[in-house]
């Protein structure tokens, strides 16, 4: 069983193929704001390197953000289109869940994801469930609001652990998978 993970929420495009729940190939490419040019060729290359066909993919996982508005939309559209056209299950994960699920043992507490002008913050319980809405804080607001708060530290994403947790989620109708927008688009401010 092959699974595909697509993550385009920040400056890197990450595409991973899992076989029976373990990472067998991964592409992580610094995109320099060229997600739309890089993501599909990276996916095709990844699949070709494994000698499989696109139809061999049994399910798709996509990071829905928060993160780069354009980056997230690109990954979500590709994942939704593939899931719909190939009639494959799709599951979504948000950027903070990627951190939570990377841990060997799930840990309750505050998690944060860096963004160019601040942080996305969420609180999770010991089962990896989001307790509150993910919120965005500028660096100044963050330093004021969370001055004496401790955050759970995740040094490195563990994609095998992420897979083991996200695969437990119920698949979603591809038409219902949407980017997670937390802050307002800059141009609308």
Q: What positions do the PLM features span?
A:
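N-terminal beta-alpha supersecondary unit
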Residues: 1-58, 135-136
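Buried hydrophobic packing segments
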Residues: 43, 78-82, 100
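A general structural signal for well-ordered alpha-helical segments in protein cores
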Residues: 36-40, 79, 159-160
């Amino acid at each position: 069983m092959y699974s595909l993970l697509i993550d385009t929420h920040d400056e890197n495009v990450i595409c991973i193929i899992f076989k029976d729940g373990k990472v067998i190939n991964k592409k992580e490419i610094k995109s320099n704001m060229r997600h739309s040019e890089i993501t599909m060729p990276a996916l095709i290359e990844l699949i070709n390197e494994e000698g499989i066909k696109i139809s061999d993919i049994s399910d798709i996982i996509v990071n829905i953000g928060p993160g780069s508005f354009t980056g997230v939309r690109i990954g979500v559209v590709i994942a939704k289109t593939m899931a719909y056209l190939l009639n494959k299950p799709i599951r979504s994960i948000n950027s903070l869940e990627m951190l939570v699920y990377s841990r060997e043992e799930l840990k309750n507490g505050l998690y944060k994801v860096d963004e160019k002008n601040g942080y996305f913050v969420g609180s999770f319980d010991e089962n990896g469930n989001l307790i509150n809405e993910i919120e965005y804080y500028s660096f100044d607001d963050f330093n004021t609001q969370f001055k004496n708060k401790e955050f759970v530290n995740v040094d490195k994403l563990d994609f095998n652990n992420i897979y083991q947790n996200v695969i437990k989620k119920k698949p979603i109708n591809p038409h219902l998978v949407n980017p997670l927008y937390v802050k307002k688009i800059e141009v609308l401010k």
